[in-house]
A protein has these predicted regions:
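Walker A/P-loop-proximal flanking segment of P-loop NTPase domains
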Residues: 2-75, 80-88
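P-loop NTPase motor core
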Residues: 19, 35, 69-133
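Substrate-engagement module of ASCE P-loop NTPases
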Residues: 159-166, 194-221
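Conserved P-loop NTPase "ATPase switch" module shared by AAA+ and STAND
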Residues: 167-198
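Structural recognition of the conserved hydrophobic beta-strand(s) that form the central parallel beta-sheet
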Residues: 174-176, 206-207, 221-228
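Amphipathic alpha-helical segments of the small helical/lid subdomains adjacent to P-loop NTPase cores
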Residues: 232-239, 246-317, 362
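Extended alpha-helical interface modules used as scaffolds for assembling large macromolecular complexes
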Residues: 243-244, 306-548, 554-556, 585-591
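Domain-level recognition of nuclease-like catalytic cores that cleave nucleotide substrates
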Residues: 560-591
Length: 591
């Protein structure tokens, strides 16, 4: 007889839920879940028709999925399994598992204006049929057959609401990425008139939302809607006066994304599962400039900042699966893909060529001001305040307090900074200015490893002059600084720190070496950029050089610089432009 021998089952570290949007899968697959369930209490006490806008890849879909599982009457039997170890499982609210759930995900709806009605109808038909199947015991008999005799999402939703009322069934309606296809429509030129027809008056999309509103009088008890921008929300819900937009509410500032404490807790856990090569503080120091610094409520400014949750998970996943080494690339390629989707919409800042261009102004002075709008119609998207707000909702800028009675916005982190500078360079390319990628990359490598700086800055100067010669209005110090900064931001070996980031002075650009990624690079740089008008004398150029020489030596002693250069050789470079011609590019010695 063979005796059973007890064996211990190996316990693996919790999975990292990078890219996962299904709450049930996250829990059942033993993933690390940052507990956002305390917000359920606040959501339940809030208006029953809840609108919430956040940038892409900020955890909206997973949060929506968590709420879906929490309120679904069919999942009452697994409530303890899913939520027992979380805050809300130990402090359940009265409404948990009390609703029939309809979930719509507009991200998979065909985004073409001419076909979107069919796409919406097809998506809703599938969702409504699923609803009828899984909740059959709570619904009148024959509801599915009756619904399928009707054409279109509007008629079918209206029918479902009437039928559900007969059995007193209460529905929680979730709509994820409600604005997915309308954002794409708006990005297309000459589509604004067609878009307006669909979102106003008797337009189909407007009628669909009106049907939801009508359903709230009978069977739709709660609605939770997520999206990326408030544009469509404003167009669709004027008159939908039962809903509340909680996007800018301080109490929901931390609903999605991660606080620094949440990031630290996650790192602490994985440090017990893997042999980290860095301390927690060191990893936070590496991650913070790239992923942190979002603020979505003015009252939260100075109190808490939010990390992009997707990027944090990307970093930790790559770190623990790469022998606990910092990833070679700090930016997830999926983020770049999402940026490209937004790019056409951002191009509504069509006055780029003008010095007052909002994005160019943001790059040049490192901030912009404006009034943060909770919503605005698409036809007013070109209004400066509305465009600034659009950049905020897309995550391209974030709240940095107030300035002269207006909200002050800054670029939140290096991930976004690179995206914005990529946008600028792409715009230059569209204006017949091409950049040889191989040549640029070779120059960047030689800058970092060989200390060959002159050719690198000459390449930037040649590119700048070529573009400016085609655009007479592109003149002035702001343009020169913005162009140079955009070019240096494309250098993979450095994180450019510009202007106000150095507290002891205003070094135009400190090329901070990314030694955590490229540990063998040997050179770092401070670039003091000066500008003279075309008519200025040589004596004035000499005076600018003397000023720059003093300044760059002083800046080299700042804590930001001394703590970052480490083993690299620090070069102090003075670059002076006279108009759009670089007339000085010299290294200065210590004084």
């Amino acid at each position: 007889m063979v005796e059973n021998q007890s064996t211990s089952i190996r316990k693996y570290p919790k999975r990292i839920p990078y890219g996962m949007m299904n709450f049930k899968a996250v829990i059942e697959d033993d993933c690390y879940y940052v507990d956002k369930t305390p917000f359920v209490e606040k959501i339940e006490r809030a208006n029953k028709f809840f609108f919430y806008i956040r940038p892409r890849r900020f955890g909206k879909s997973l949060t929506l999925s968590m709420l879906e599982h929490y309120y679904d009457i069919n999942r009452a039997n697994i409530f303890d399994k899913l939520f027992g170890h979380l805050y809300i499982g130990q402090h359940p609210t009265p409404e948990h598992n009390k609703y029939l759930v309809i979930k719509l995900n507009f991200a998979i709806v065909n985004a073409e204006l001419n076909d979107y009605k069919k796409g919406l109808d097809d998506h809703c038909r599938i969702a409504f049929n699923f609803f009828c199947d899984v909740y059959a015991q709570y619904l009148p008999k024959g509801i599915k057959e009756g619904m399928n005799q009707l054409d279109g999402a509007v008629k079918q939703l209206n029918f479902l609401c009437r039928e559900c009322e007969k059995t007193n069934a209460k529905v929680f309606l979730f709509i994820d990425e409600y604005d997915h296809f309308t954002n794409k429509i708006l990005a297309e030129p000459n589509c604004l008139d067609k878009y307006r027809k669909e979102t106003h008056g008797e337009g189909y999309l407007r009628t669909f939302f009106d049907t939801i509103k009508a359903g709230t009088d009978s069977t739709i008890a709660r609605v939770f809607v997520t999206g990326v921008s408030p544009v469509t929300l404003d167009d669709l819900t004027s008159g939908f006066n039962i809903g509340t937009n909680y996007t800018l509410s301080a109490q929901f500032n931390e609903l999605t994304g991660f606080t620094e404490k949440e990031v630290r807790d996650m790192l602490e856990y994985y440090s017990t599962q893997y042999e980290f090569n860095h301390t927690i503080d060191e990893l936070i120091t590496i991650m913070k400039p790239w992923y942190d610094n979002y603020c979505f409520a003015l009252k939260k400014y100075g109190k808490v900042t939010m990390y992009n949750s997707n990027m944090v998970l990307y970093f930790i996943d790559n770190y623990v699966n790469n022998d606990c080494e910092v990833p070679d690339h700090m930016i997830d390629e999926n983020i770049r893909t999402d940026y490209n989707k937004l790019r056409m919409l951002i191009r509504r800042d069509k006055e780029f060529a003008h010095d007052a261009s909002i994005i160019q102004q943001l790059v040049q002075q490192d901030y912009i001001t404006g009034e943060l709008k909770s919503g605005f119609p698409a036809e007013l998207i070109g209004n400066p305040d509305n465009f600034v707000s659009l950049l905020f909702y897309f995550g391209m800028v974030t709240i940095d307090g107030t300035l002269e009675g207006k909200t002050k916005f800054i670029i939140p982190n290096e991930v976004v900074r690179e995206q914005l500078f990529t946008y600028l360079l792409d715009t230059y390319k569209e204006n017949d200015l091409s950049f040889d990628s191989y040549e640029k990359n070779e120059l960047a490598s030689h800058l970092a490893y060989r200390g060959e700086w002159k050719a690198y800055f000459q390449y930037i100067a040649d590119s700048l002059h070529k573009y400016a010669s085609q655009r007479d209005h592109q003149k002035g110090e702001y343009f020169v600084h913005g162009f140079t900064l955009a070019m240096t931001c494309q250098n993979q070996y450095y994180r450019p720190i510009s202007e106000k980031d150095t507290q002891e002075g205003y070094a135009d650009i400190f090329l901070c070496p990314l030694l955590d990624i490229y540990s063998d690079m040997t050179h770092s740089y401070i670039v003091e950029l000066k500008y003279a008008k075309s008519k200025d004398t040589d004596a004035h150029i000499q005076q600018l050089f003397k000023e720059a020489e003093v300044q760059v030596n002083r800046y080299a002693q700042s804590e930001v610089v001394t703590s970052a250069v480490k083993t690299t050789q620090l070069h102090k470079i003075v670059v002076i432009y006279k108009g759009t011609e670089m007339v000085v590019c010299e290294e200065v010695n210590n004084q």
